[in-house]
Amino acid sequence: MEDFVRQCFNPMIVELAEKTMKEYGENPKIETNKFAAICTHMEVCFMYSDFHFINERGESIIIEPGDSNALLKHRFEIIEGRDRNMAWTVVNSICNTTGVGKPRFLPDLYDYKEDRFIKIGVTRREVHIYYLEKANKIKSEETHIHIFSFTGEEMATKADYTLDEESRARIKTRLFTIRQEMASRGLWDSFVSPREAKRQLKKDLKSKGQCEGLLTKVSHQTSQVSTTLEPMWMDSSRMATLRASFPKCLEK
């Protein structure tokens, strides 16, 4: 799974996911399913934001890569992918500037057009179940929730999907492609089932002679990938800003 993640996702997303896991004391080489899930979630958040701007009349517009957007404001502020302290700094700054209420939990994005925080979810389960879990945890009408699944389903607060249909279709297509690529490499079942992931992890580590002292609580697998899945296009300037938001000590 680790090799698949490194070949499937944009290198900057992989780097941010590694830093995020290390920030919480997690090892992406062992907890590979979580590594894949974090990369997927980050990519969806960035795809949600990419190409969306606000013009001088306050209208939301879409600008494709290569078109001039120097004088336009990004519609979405990306919070996901920053280290925790920086993320809360951004949230506090937005709250002070806009007057919106401060969320209890870190959101993933802020929508300057609708003046609301957004929590993005990507689930391997039923979308309505995952949506209810998120809603019960957040318990705030000020944070908008938008859930995507790997099967093309989605669910959002008050059925308000924020983005146009084409933008959402890009995200759904990407998630479906990731699922298909995982399945073709025999990785999907363990990605969905913690029990299967735990069994596969033990098997893989044993074959590498790394099973000594392994905590059986770990529920993620490591596997090998030989082919490459095309990484998505990324807004490099915004990604560079996110990379810079992590303290240098996390590089160790």
Curated annotation (Swiss-Prot):
Gene3D superfamilies xref list: Influenza RNA-dependent RNA polymerase subunit PA, endonuclease domain
Entry-linked InterPro entries: PA/PA-X, PA/PA-X_sf
Pfam families according to UniProt: Flu_PA
Active site (UniProt): 80, 108
Site (Important for efficient shutoff activity and nuclear localization): 195, 198-199
Listed GO MF terms: RNA binding
UniProt key word Membrane: no
Residue(s) at site: Important for efficient shutoff activity: 202-203, 206
UniProt keywords, alphabetically: Decay of host mRNAs by virus, Eukaryotic host gene expression shutoff by virus, Host cytoplasm, Host gene expression shutoff by virus, Host mRNA suppression by virus, Host nucleus, Host-virus interaction
Gene Ontology biological process terms, A to Z: viral RNA genome replication; viral translational frameshifting
Cellular compartments annotated: Host cytoplasm; Host nucleus
Domain of life: Viruses
Family membership noted in the UniProt record: Belongs to the influenza viruses PA-X family.
Domain comment in the entry: The probable endonuclease active site in the N-terminus and the basic amino acid cluster in the C-terminus are important for the shutoff activity. The C-terminus acts as a nuclear localization signal. The C-terminus is recruited to host protein complexes involved in nuclear Pol II RNA processing.
Protein function: Plays a major role in the shutoff of the host protein expression by cleaving mRNAs probably via an endonuclease activity. This host shutoff allows the virus to escape from the host antiviral response. Hijacks host RNA splicing machinery to selectively target host RNAs containing introns for destruction. This may explain the preferential degradation of RNAs that have undergone co- or post-transcriptional processing.
Protein name: Protein PA-X
Organism: Influenza A virus (strain A/Swine/Tennessee/26/1977 H1N1)
